[in-house]
Each structure stands twice: as C-alpha cells, then as structure tokens.
C-alpha cells in the first residue's frame, strides 16, 4: 500500500474500517453490526499504535494524517493474520519520522504474529535493517541475494558495490538506492 490514502474507506469511521477488515472472508448477514466486544478489541489494537486513534474511533478516516492512515491500513491488513504480508513501498509517501514509526510498528506486528512478510523498498538502509533476507533485482533479474550473518554485516556501501559488480555498471542515482 504505497499510497496511504488507499486501503481504507475515507468516508467511514475508524471502527467501521476495522470491522470490515475483521469480517473479511465472512458472509455478510444481520449480525455484521459493530458490537461492544468488537469496539473493545479495536480500542486495544489501536492503543498499540500509540497514535491516539483509540480515542477517535468515530472519526472519519479521511481526517487522519498519512501516517495514521498507513498504520491503520497495516492493522487492517494483519487483523486476520495473513499467510503472506506484502508491503510494497509502504512508507514511501511518509515523512522520515512517520516512516520510522510505521516501520517499527510493522516489525512489532510481524514479530508478534509470526508473519511471513515481503517488503519491497528502494531504501537500502531499511532493506538492511529489516528482515532476514535481502534480494536486489534489476531489469527483472535477481542480482543480489543475501541472508543471515552475511546480510547482518553488510553496510549500504557494501550493498551498492555488490549490486554494481553484479549489474556490470555503476548506478546513476544514489537517491534511488539510498532513499
């Protein structure tokens, strides 16, 4: 969810968005309405975000900041514990401080729920910091594939050199790789 404005229903309340996510895969029926048990569960989940959203359950999602919406979207995506969580540049549209908070939240949720995640990013620092395996692609080909201790000991400069060696050329834009 590259765009924090996607993944949620802007005209609906926070608790309504969470209710839709919680009922994903179920047949809609008369018991689909929000109840106190769901409300309490949603409040507890939102408290973990530490964004104050638990006190704004009836606020329209369209009134939230990009970071708040991205955090809410992450909660909605993981509420049913997916087999694979695909994160496609999920912090790209956020300022650095908010991106760091969303990445920290992402890491907590993945660790807590023991999720398998695939994070796509152009930010090499994030690629090195998060996850247990790093794959770099160029023109549809895998050029770098590192894991474990090898990944843990790499620096951004090491990674750039590995990539340049595998690609057979130097890169034009450090911004592309450094984020």
PLM segments and residue spans:
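Helical segment within the ABC ATPase nucleotide-binding domain
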Residues: 100-113
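Q-loop/switch helix immediately C-terminal to the Walker
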Residues: 10-24
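Catalytic Walker B motif of ABC-type/P-loop ATPase nucleotide-binding domains
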Residues: 85-88
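Helix N-cap at the start of a conserved alpha-helix in ABC-type nucleotide-binding domains
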Residues: 96-98
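H-loop/switch region of ABC-family ATPase nucleotide-binding domains
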Residues: 121-122
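ABC ATPase C-loop
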Residues: 77-78
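Conserved beta-strand-loop-alpha-helix hinge in the C-terminal portion
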Residues: 141-167
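Conserved catalytic motifs of ABC-family nucleotide-binding domains
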Residues: 81
């Amino acid at each position: 969810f590259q765009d924090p404005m996607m993944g949620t229903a802007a005209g609906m309340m926070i608790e309504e968005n969470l209710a839709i996510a919680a009922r994903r895969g179920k047949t809609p029926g008369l018991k689909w309405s929000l109840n106190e048990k769901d409300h309490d569960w949603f409040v507890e989940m939102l408290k973990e975000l530490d964004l104050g959203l638990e006190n704004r359950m009836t606020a329209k999602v369209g009134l939230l900041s990009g970071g708040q919406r991205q955090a809410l979207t992450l909660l909605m995506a993981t509420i049913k514990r997916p087999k694979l969580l695909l994160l496609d540049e999920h912090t790209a549209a956020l300022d650095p401080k908010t991106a760091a908070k969303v990445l920290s939240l992402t890491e907590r949720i993945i660790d807590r729920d023991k999720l398998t995640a695939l994070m796509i990013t152009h930010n090499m620092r994030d690629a090195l910091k998060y996850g247990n395996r790093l794959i770099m692609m160029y023109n549809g080909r895998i050029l770098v594939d590192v894991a474990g201790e090898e990944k843990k000991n790499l620096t951004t400069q090491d990674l750039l050199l590995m990539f340049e060696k595998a690609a057979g050329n130097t890169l034009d834009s450090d911004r592309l790789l450094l984020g």
